[in-house]
Amino acid sequence: MDETRYRDPIDRLVEPGERVLAHAKADVGQGLAPAPPPEPESTVAPGWRTVGSVLLNVLLPLATWDRGDRLVDAIGWGIAGRGAPGSAASRLHRALRPPRPDLQVRETLLAVTDRRLLVCRTGGVKLLAGREAEERALAETSVAWSATRAEIASARVGWHRLNPKRLRIDFTDGSWLSFTVPIADSGRPLREVAAALSA
């Protein structure tokens, strides 16, 4: 994996005078995630109930069971993060995993500057797209979420299950979220991000 190809898009996103100390391509850790932030109040007035809406309210809980999904995540993957609804980890997780994804492949990039932590997303690419689509997606990289350095309590890389390359970022509000890379990829970029956040 060539980490240098991500540096130019990140450099375009920082403010003038802001220095990039470390960056890494990573994925949010699999497993039990922090609770989602509270949803904003709906401004749409309630309408008439239809037979379809009543049936969906009856059948939808049978098709998906949130507690069952969370139990499978906890047993199979462990815990990917913790935090109350609206915490830093909760907002970060929601920024990277929205409730209604567009089903395109996006890369997550972590960048530590002398002022903040940037969590960036590349543009969307369809599965099995060509090299030109990947370059276009890289050019469409944008900041999905950011936090000042004062909001970061600590960061460290360590073992989780069989993967020795899991970055855990702890926030000052007590929440935390993990990021991983595939076992075949180098853990050096994650260690550099952890060192830059801890400095």
Each model region followed by its residue ranges:
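Short, charged/polar low-complexity linear motifs in solvent-exposed/disordered segments
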Residues: 39-40, 137, 195-198
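Terminal and domain-flanking low-complexity segments
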Residues: 1-23, 165, 172-199
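Phosphoinositide-binding peripheral membrane targeting modules
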Residues: 62-176, 183-184
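Intrinsically disordered, low-complexity acidic/polar segments
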Residues: 31-33, 39, 126, 178, ...
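Anionic N-terminal interaction surfaces
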Residues: 1-110
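Low-complexity, flexible helical/coil segments
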Residues: 57-61, 158, 188-191
